From Swiss-Prot:
Organism: Emericella nidulans (strain FGSC A4 / ATCC 38163 / CBS 112.46 / NRRL 194 / M139)
SUPFAM superfamilies to which the protein is assigned, alphabetical: MFS general substrate transporter
PANTHER family for this protein: MAJOR FACILITATOR SUPERFAMILY, SIDEROPHORE IRON TRANSPORTER 2
Protein's name according to its UniProt entry: Siderophore iron transporter mirA
Keyword Ribonucleoprotein part of the UniProt annotation: no
A Gene Ontology term for the protein's cellular component: plasma membrane
Pfam families: MFS_1
Upper classification of the organism: Eukaryota, Fungi, Dikarya, Ascomycota, Pezizomycotina
Chain intervals for the UniProt region annotation (Disordered): 1-35
Subcellular location: Membrane
Length: 609
């Protein structure tokens, strides 16, 4: 692919091509308070115009290197968690670490998007890498569960920030027709080797060193691997400041006067630009809503009977509604502009993400346990089956991106992906309990999971580009954060529902079907797959255990398929976004009417590549 494809501005469309007339930019005087570009967005816009071919080559090389190191760190450090658990001898407390990490990741998306819009993309890369390095350093030196959880908070913020800023950076420097390609390549080319080689690295580290060094080494490796990306961005950012500013930036006020007192500057930064009150409402609302969902996950569904959990859930919803009201009517620089929420493409894409990740979590939480107990697979094959969805997703994302590039439309790939997800889940529903004690083999499960992964790769890649195309350039980071957060929220809810179904289904079935002499072991068998696997395959006890696992996993599969079914209707609400010069110009300048006027008499010319 030619490097010209990376350019955010259609080649020749804004400057030299007489057939495509540049629309008048929207100046601050023409914008509402919420539409005025924030400092970080202005900086990103000036940087976008200042990139050279050589600079983009170096920047994307650095992006691939940084992404590779972060993905290797993520997948290899998962191996060390049981060792940390054993060191603290507080296995039950580790679930609290997962809860805090999940909540932190979801809440971090909109906060990081806002910080990126205020301070800039390079600055957010730096902040994210620092947070992740500090998190790994705390992991390496932690002496108790509290410190381990603190490390998890830093690591969660860092990894979430890097992933989001990576996608926003790609959106900044690509036009719509090439965006899907470049947004999928960094992860697609690095996740697959990290997925399989990360565990090999972890095992090699454990042979010669303890788990603490396994965490700590990434606090060194990741910042080093990120120097090329961050250094290149800072260099071109500094160079862009020295160049004459384009008219649309030169004429815009800086949102504050240099003669203002320090307290006015602090007020403008904290209250207006960062919307501190909105941030507090958002964090409180999400935390109160997600804590009970997370704590009632795979093993504590009985806690729903506690009044405090219901109260937290209700209060969280109320505060989140208050946040939406504040953002809509009061905030000058809202986290989520109201016009974005009411856009049907954005709303539909977020609903697709919520339902898809709800289905995935409902089915997958206990799937590897089911594979090892009822399907008699070892831990290795069970992991390979589960990972097949991730691999298929990454590969399909690349193909979907290129298909979008050549068809110059997004909706058709949503229409392709969603039915594939439903089909794959339908096959899984059949495979988990085929009747007469039969279940699918490894190849069948891999095929079904791969169908879901391919479907997700198609619809999610197309949906992300679609939602980014429906907002102005200054709102790309926010809409991307909302899109990712919606998927995470769906996953959190799905985990809780899976725990409730599993806990209400498996124990009664075990108590009912186990041989009389083993009925008192029902709770022990439910609580540990190790205990369940101790019973020899083919014995009455193991046959009863296998049947109970099959029936319980089938219930989860039914719930997952039911969640996917509405997606077949929701997908029609996404607009068919044309990936053309005209759409790119609208995104760049936010002046839809001027662009339409300049392109009257026919569709805009397609972006050149």
């Amino acid at each position: 692919m030619a490097l010209d494809d990376i350019s955010a501005v259609p080649k020749g469309a804004l400057d030299t091509d007489p057939a495509v007339e540049r629309p008048p930019p929207l100046l601050d005087a023409d914008r509402s308070d919420s539409e005025r570009l924030q400092p970080g967005v202005k900086r990103a816009e000036m940087l976008r115009k200042g990139w050279t071919r050589q600079g983009l080559i170096i920047a994307f090389t650095g992006l691939f290197l940084a992404t590779l190191s972060i993905n290797f760190g993520d997948y290899s450090t998962q191996v060390y968690v049981p060792y940390a658990t054993s060191a603290f001898k507080q296995h039950s407390a580790m679930s609290a670490a997962r809860v805090v990490g999940n909540i932190t990741r979801i809440a971090a998306y909109p906060i990081i998007a806002k910080l990126g819009d205020v301070f800039g993309r390079a600055e957010m890369f730096i902040l994210s890498i620092v947070f992740q390095a500090v998190g790994y350093a705390i992991y390496a030196g932690c002496k108790n569960v509290g410190q381990y959880i603190a490390g998890g908070i830093f690591e969660a913020i860092g990894s979430t920030g890097f992933g989001l800023t990576q996608q926003v950076f790609v959106a900044d420097v690509t036009n719509l027709i090439n965006r899907a390609v470049w947004s999928t390549l960094p992860d697609s080319l690095t996740v697959i080797p990290a997925l399989y080689l990360g565990t090999e690295i972890a095992e090699a580290v454990l042979e010669k060193n303890e788990w603490r060094w396994g965490f700590g080494m990434w606090a060194i490796i990741e910042p080093v691997c990120s120097v090329l990306l961050v250094g290149t961005m800072l260099y071109y950012q500094k160079r862009a400041r020295k160049d004459p500013s384009p008219a649309e930036f030169a004429s815009e006020p800086t949102e504050r006067n240099v003669d203002d007192g320090w307290w006015k500057r602090i007020y403008n930064l904290v209250w207006v630009q960062l919307d501190a009150f909105g941030a507090i409402l958002l964090l409180l609302g999400l935390s109160l809503f997600l804590v009970p969902l997370s704590l009632t996950g795979s093993g504590n569904s009985d806690d729903w009977h506690r009044g405090s959990f219901i109260a937290m859930l209700v209060l969280g919803v109320v505060i989140f509604v208050a946040f939406l009201a504040w953002d809509t009517w009061c905030a000058k620089k809202p986290f989520i502009p109201y016009r974005m929420i009411k856009n049907r493409t954005v709303a539909a894409a977020c609903l697709l993400g919520i339902l898809d990740f709800f289905h995935y979590s409902v089915f997958s939480v206990f799937f590897t346990s089911y594979l090892q107990v009822a399907a008699h697979h070892g831990a290795g094959p069970a992991t390979r089956i589960d990972n097949s969805l991730r691999v298929a997703f990454q590969v399909a994302g690349i193909f979907a991106a290129y298909f979008m590039k050549f068809t110059k439309r997004s909706q058709v790939w949503v229409f392709t992906g969603v039915p594939l997800c439903v089909l794959g889940m339908g096959v899984l529903l059949y495979l988990v309990d085929m009747g007469e004690g039969r279940v699918g083999n490894e190849a069948a499960f891999v095929t079904a999971k791969s169908l879901i992964g391919i479907g997700r790769g198609f619809y999610q890649t197309a949906s992300q580009v679609s939602v980014q195309a429906k907002v102005s350039r200054g709102e790309v980071s926010v809409v991307t954060a909302v899109f990712f957060a919606a998927m995470s929220i769906g996953g959190a809810i799905g985990t809780s529902v899976a725990g409730a179904i599993w806990r209400s289904t498996l124990p009664p079935k075990l108590a009912q079907h186990l041989p009389a002499e083993l009925k008192d072991q029902a709770q022990a068998i439910f609580g540990s797959i190790v205990v369940a696997q101790k019973y020899e395959v083919g014995t009455p006890a193991r046959d009863a255990i296998d049947m109970c696992y099959r029936q319980s996993q089938r219930m989860l599969a039914i719930a997952a398929l039911a969640a996917l079914a509405p997606m077949l209707i929701i997908m029609f609400f996404l607009e068919n976004v044309p990936l053309t010069d005209e759409t790119t110009l609208i995104e760049l300048h936010g002046n839809r009417e001027a662009v339409k006027k300049n392109h009257s008499g026919g569709e805009g010319k397609e972006a050149r590549s």
